[in-house]
Amino acid sequence: MSETYDFLFKFLVIGSAGTGKSCLLHQFIENKFKQDSNHTIGVEFGSRVVNVGGKTVKLQIWDTAGQERFRSVTRSYYRGAAGALLVYDITSRETYNALTNWLTDARTLASPNIVIILCGNKKDLDADREVTFLEASRFAQENELMFLETSALTGENVEEAFLKCARSIPNKIESGELDPERMGSGIQYGDASLRQIRQPRGSAAQTKQQCNC
């Protein structure tokens, strides 16, 4: 009945309205393009189990509305997110210019160490491009983000965007930047034995003490 997995990661898909966030989620979950997609009202949800470094990981993905009138609602879903796709439309400079605000929200409301990948969506509309690859690459580098251009229509780089983000999370667990034992980390163990992943530097006693708080 229930799915078995080693880890569960909470993901967000954030960005301005009309950037194709719901279509990216649908392409990743269903492996097909979502025709006649309307603007998301509030939040939508999807999940998929993937393989990350030999571990089975369930991605629990929240697709948030990009319209300003829903921001107060969607911000509540940022809490406890381990990863995020920050999406803009390569044919709309307005959506690109709004990225800083979305990024600030994510790092303030979710976690300073949330893993974020910048996605320039609608790559299939290259002839109508308003934001160059180089410009977005620089933004990503300056803000310590991963970066890919994607197409929810053709599926190009959609799978890779989610998986690239997911692959970075175990590294942050091992380095101590993300702590699955901390409430709101956006990470849950499906297999209790995996708690050993974060026992470097002789921190077992410290972790035990933290858990008793």
From Swiss-Prot:
Xref: Gene3D superfamilies: P-loop containing nucleotide triphosphate hydrolases
Keyword set includes Lipoprotein: yes
Cofactors required: Mg(2+)
Record-linked CDD domains: Rab4
Short motif Switch 2, span: 65-74
Any one GO cellular component localisation term in the record: plasma membrane
Pfam families tied to this protein: Ras
Residues the record lists as binding Mg(2+): 22, 40, 63
Activity modulation comment: Regulated by guanine nucleotide exchange factors (GEFs) which promote the exchange of bound GDP for free GTP. Regulated by GTPase activating proteins (GAPs) which increase the GTP hydrolysis activity. Inhibited by GDP dissociation inhibitors (GDIs).
Residues with the 5-glutamyl serotonin modification: 67
GO biological process: protein transport; Rab protein signal transduction; regulation of endocytosis; vesicle-mediated transport
Note on domains (UniProt): Switch 1, switch 2 and the interswitch regions are characteristic of Rab GTPases and mediate the interactions with Rab downstream effectors. The switch regions undergo conformational changes upon nucleotide binding which drives interaction with specific sets of effector proteins, with most effectors only binding to GTP-bound Rab.
Similarity comment text for this entry: Belongs to the small GTPase superfamily. Rab family.
Protein name, per record: Ras-related protein Rab-4B
Organism per entry: Danio rerio (Zebrafish)
